[in-house]
Amino acid sequence: MNAPRTPKPARKKPDSATPAKPVEPRKEASLHPRNRHQGRYDFPALIKTTPELAKFVITNPYGKESIDFASPDAVRVFNRALLKSFYGIQHWDIPADYLCPPVPGRADYIHFLADLLASNNDGVVPRGAIVNVLDIGMGANCVYPLIGNSEYRWHFLGSEIDPTAVAAARAIVQSNDLNKVIQLRQQENRKHILIGLLEPGERFDLTMCNPPFHASMEEATKGSERKWRALGKADPKRKLPVLNFGGQSAELWCEGGEARFVTQLIAESANFAHKVLWFSTLVSKASNLPAIETALKKAGALESQVVEMSQGQKQSRFVAWTFQTKSEQQIWRRERWVRK
């Protein structure tokens, strides 16, 4: 005769008064290995260097410290804290409604460009004043020159068409005593990017650019509204201005959008084929790559590459090209980077 079965204890119903904590999406650790912004932000350490950040720190739905990335003031102070803590920038501010870029992604572009130069230098990143970099459209934030000089001691020339942005960037450079390593220049002719900007005898090891990616203000506004919706901040009763996400018109859009800007940059770069070793630009839309490849062939670029980057769930890339042969690249290295 079989023994009676012991009944299984009934499962307890979950306490409806204590909802389960949301599981935070896992972020891929895909920043450049030399990028200083690996892992989560240490907010207590950031607040120690920049006390005004404290009032912007919140607890996100996953129970982690963060900031409200939809708040321009919070993002601006957060960037100030990052630049001070990681790059020694003591004074940094930008005018209201100007682009306030994410620092980790900007640092990635710098580090991958350093790898590009290392590929011409036996795997060693050239450092110091022997490297000159042109930042095309530096913006009011001047972030690329600040990071590039802090990390590699490179010298920079930042170009910009907006006089207000030039004045803001100059204030940052002067207040941090960086006048000798970061120079600024306004492009007076809005129809050109490089033509009319560079002076006779100037040579650059790199150019870099974060081009405007929208083709109209309407398109830029829609892009801003998508970001608001992604952050759960969209208000269907009120039309959100594009500048809520930061950025003047010249920073966000140009006629023809990113594809036209980049193809014009490529066409103009051919005029400076032996004044620059590597030209480069960010490309936000992968769909623009075929047109860019066509423009590179038309301009006569001898070598080009697409470098993919990833910051968490965001994918980005830059295109780099040169008009110099391998032997000319080695001559450039010997003349500029090899210490006599």
Swiss-Prot record:
SUPFAM superfamilies: S-adenosyl-L-methionine-dependent methyltransferases (SSF53335). Keywords: Cytoplasm, Methyltransferase, rRNA processing, S-adenosyl-L-methionine, Transferase. GO terms for cellular component: cytoplasm. It catalyses: adenosine(1618) in 23S rRNA + S-adenosyl-L-methionine = N(6)-methyladenosine(1618) in 23S rRNA + S-adenosyl-L-homocysteine + H(+). Coiled coil: none annotated. It comes from the Bacteria. One of its GO terms (molecular function) is 23S rRNA (adenine(1618)-N(6))-methyltransferase activity. It holds the Pfam family Methyltransf_10. Residues 1-36 are annotated as: Disordered. Its EC number is 2.1.1.181. It is found in: Cytoplasm. CDD domains: AdoMet_MTases (cd02440). GO terms for biological process: rRNA base methylation. It is an enzyme of class 2 (transferase). Belongs to the methyltransferase superfamily. METTL16/RlmF family. Specifically methylates the adenine in position 1618 of 23S rRNA. This is Ribosomal RNA large subunit methyltransferase F. It comes from Pseudomonas fluorescens (strain Pf0-1). The gene is rlmF.
